[in-house]
Regions:
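Short, basic (Lys/Arg/His-rich) helix/loop patches that form interaction surfaces
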Residues: 200, 220-222, 247-288, 292-295, ...
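C-terminal catalytic core of Y-nucleophile DNA break-rejoin enzymes
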Residues: 42-43, 192-212, 224-251
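Basic, Lys/Arg- and aromatic-enriched nucleic-acid-binding interface segment
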Residues: 139-168, 194-196
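DNA breakage-rejoining catalytic core of tyrosine-based enzymes
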Residues: 116-119, 129-147, 195-205, 218-226, ...
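Catalytic-site neighborhood detector that most strongly recognizes the C-terminal catalytic loop/helix
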Residues: 136, 194, 290-315
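C-terminal secondary-structure termini that scaffold catalytic or DNA-interacting sites
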Residues: 1-17, 315-321
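Conserved tyrosine-mediated DNA breakage-rejoining catalytic core shared by Y-recombinases
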Residues: 169, 173-209, 296
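N-terminal core-binding DNA-recognition domain of tyrosine recombinases/integrases
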Residues: 10-13, 28-43, 50-133
Length: 321
């Protein structure tokens, strides 16, 4: 396979010999490079693999495009245009946000390809999206969610999403040994995207509740995961909660709380990040705690309202007077 052939310096043979690379080999090489950079298999599949292997490559085959030299700006613009006119599984046009998720990995791949010597002459354009405020949950709504949860386990899960900004996959991976203490402060060791580890601050009350939850379960669970199912597995032990199980619980609790909103774990994380910014947390510090890049913070949290902007300026200019 062309994707397995390498020249000196890790470049595809096609680039080293001056011949344009086949598009399918280029995709394979790029995904290999992403994995070598430390991206997790999950991130690779969800953020890059689907867009490149299931959307971009089939489109190239339908259009008869075989090599990078055929990916002119006009051709790449046609790729974006075709996506904008494509229908989703529900029979509706793809949203501009969905088109972004498919186009961005192609742009990143072509940028990488240019860096290794491929004859890249264009980039697919990202359709302009209307900027609007994203929905968030208020502290009152989060309190209602916790009140509606039926078990202490579920209440603690709600709080970890809302007060620590954890991702769904991060929460289900927590073990009892991930609770760390230094002097009078508590932290949660979290394994985030790309298997990167970070410490997330946990306020005293929530830390105590985590301790009690761990002690209550004791050794009556399969493995070392902190959050387990109330049902026992075939071995008589409580099995770890799955991501789908947690997501279903959050949705069910939201219906019980009658919030009138579609609530999911990421909305709780998003609400936490928005609140931290509104209360003046440094975006660089927030990115480190949340396990997100500063670029993501800038792109996805530019939705703060005019009132938020006014308050930020007032704090900066009037706070010390």
């Amino acid at each position: 396979m062309a994707s397995m052939a390498r020249a000196a310096g890790g470049r595809p043979k096609t680039a080293a010999t001056g011949e344009p690379a086949p598009v399918d080999s280029l995709v394979s090489d790029y995904l290999t490079s992403c994995r070598a950079r430390g991206l997790s298999v999950r991130t690779l599949d969800n953020a890059y693999g689907f867009a490149l292997e299931r959307v971009f490559l089939p489109w190239c085959r339908r259009e008869g495009i075989r090599t990078t030299t055929e990916l002119s700006q006009l051709v790449l613009d046609r790729f974006t245009t075709d996506l904008l006119s494509r229908q989703s599984e529900r029979g509706r046009p793809l949203s501009k946000a969905s088109v972004h998720t498919y186009v961005r990995p192609v742009r990143q791949m072509l940028h990488w390809a240019e860096g290794i010597g491929e004859p890249v002459t264009g980039r697919p354009q990202l359709p302009k999206q209307p900027r609007r405020e994203k929905e968030v949950l208020s502290r009152h709504e989060i309190d209602r969610l916790e009140d509606a949860a039926r078990t202490e386990r579920d209440k603690v899960i709600i709080r970890l999403f809302a007060d620590c900004g954890l991702r769904l996959s991060e929460l289900t991976g927590i073990s009892a040994g991930d609770i760390r203490r230094t002097a009078n402060r508590s932290y949660l060791r979290v394994h985030g995207k790309g298997d990167r580890e970070r410490l997330v601050p946990v306020l005293p009350d929530l830390a105590r509740r985590l301790d009690r939850l761990g002690r209550a379960q004791g050794g009556d669970r399969a493995g070392d995961r902190l959050f387990t199912s109330s049902r026992r597995g075939s071995g008589g032990e409580h099995e770890p909660l799955t991501e789908s199980g947690v997501a279903q619980m959050v949705s069910a609790v939201a219906r019980e709380a009658q919030l009138g909103k579609a609530v999911h774990p990421h909305l709780l994380r998003h609400s936490w990040m928005t609140e931290m910014l509104r209360k003046g947390m440094n975006p660089i510090q927030l990115a480190a705690i949340a396990g997100a890049s500063e670029k993501v913070i800038a792109e996805h949290y530019a939705h703060l309202s005019q009132d938020d902007a006014y308050e930020a300026v007032a704090r900066a200019l009037l706070g010390s007077r």
